[in-house]
């Protein structure tokens, strides 16, 4: 089963469960230029420009979390790619999967801007840029 947490809830979960891994599934460009949560593991689910699924995704996750009972929190821009990635991990046998709702940037506002009404960065959680 895949659970959902808001960014503040995910941050509290990570503090309470040091064995958990936060996996940022966004593209390399998003991770580097938009920013990313501090201490997140970067494993792209899809990559720009063709948006094909990363065929090494599952192997890369297994490198950082070999134990299928490791709690894995997945984060993307707004919460959809991370959910897709979590479904694949669930099929692969991972049992503690959490989709971070709102993602890093949150949904678009009325002006078609992100980061104004949700997301990791909006909530003031620890993040950095490369």
How does the language model describe each region?
Residues 1-21, 28-71, 82-130:
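Rhodanese-like catalytic fold shared by cysteine-dependent sulfurtransferases
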Residues 75:
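Short, surface-exposed ligand- or partner-binding patches at beta-edge/loop junctions that are enriched
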């Amino acid at each position: 089963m895949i659970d959902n947490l808001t960014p503040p809830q995910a941050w509290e979960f990570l503090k309470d469960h040091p064995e958990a891994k936060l996996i940022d599934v966004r593209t390399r460009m998003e991770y580097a230029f938009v920013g990313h949560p501090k201490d997140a593991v970067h494993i792209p689910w899809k990559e720009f420009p063709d948006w094909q699924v990363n065929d090494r995704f599952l192997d890369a996750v297994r490198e950082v979390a070999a134990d299928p009972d490791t709690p894995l929190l997945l984060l993307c821009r707004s919460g959809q790619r991370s959910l897709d990635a979590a479904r694949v991990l669930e099929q692969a046998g991972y049992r503690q999967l959490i989709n971070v709702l709102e993602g890093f940037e949150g949904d678009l506002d009325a002006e078609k801007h992100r980061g104004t009404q949700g997301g990791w960065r909006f909530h003031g959680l620890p993040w950095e840029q490369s």
